[in-house]
């Protein structure tokens, strides 16, 4: 049976090696903005939260979130997600994150990701809001 849990900061080192590979794959879609070491620092030093999905045998997936305080609203951002057998833990993870967000004064959840995530979330009541555009600047 799949369970999901927040990982308190003092326990991150005990499970990091098991989730590092999942999260490394997620950083490959950041176009050089993040490496997996940056995610480790984010959860250990900068207030991001690590969540895991697991069964009696192994950790199946990991999500990193952070709270974003906008001038008018506060959202829990699902910043990074990775794992295997996603369909087995997606719903319990989203329910846990919804509950945590409500209990901590957030007005909603948000995620930034590639277009494929639209299919994942469309049955969950999520809506697509916008695209992001990038203009790299020459460094020379």
PLM regions with names:
Residues 1-34:
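Short amphipathic alpha-helix that is part of the acyltransferase structural core
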Residues 21-34, 53, 70-81, 98-102, ...:
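Long, low-complexity, intrinsically disordered polar/charged segments
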Residues 28-48:
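Active-site rim helix/loop that mediates acceptor-substrate recognition in acyltransferases
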Residues 45-87:
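Conserved donor-binding loop and adjoining core beta-sheet/short helix segment
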Residues 47-48, 123-127:
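Short glycine-aromatic motifs
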Residues 71-124:
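Acyl-donor binding region in acyl/amide transferases
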Residues 112, 127-139:
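Conserved catalytic-core motifs of GNAT/GCN5-like acyltransferases
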Residues 118, 139-140:
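Flexible, glycine-rich phosphate/dinucleotide-binding loops
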């Amino acid at each position: 049976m799949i369970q999901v849990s927040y990982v308190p900061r003092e326990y991150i080192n005990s499970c990091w090696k098991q989730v590092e590979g999942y999260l490394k794959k997620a950083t490959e879609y950041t176009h050089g903005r993040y490496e997996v070491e940056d995610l480790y620092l984010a959860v250990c030093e900068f207030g991001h939260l690590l969540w895991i999905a697991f069964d009696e045998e192994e950790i199946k997936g990991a999500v990193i979130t952070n709270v974003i305080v906008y001038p008018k609203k506060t959202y829990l951002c699902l910043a990074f997600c990775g794992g295997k057998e996603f369909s087995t833990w997606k719903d319990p993870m989203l329910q846990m994150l919804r509950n945590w967000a409500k209990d901590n004064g957030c007005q909603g959840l948000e995620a930034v990701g590639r277009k494929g995530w639209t299919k994942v979330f469309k049955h969950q009541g999520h809506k697509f809001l916008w695209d992001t555009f990038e203009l790299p600047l020459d460094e020379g």
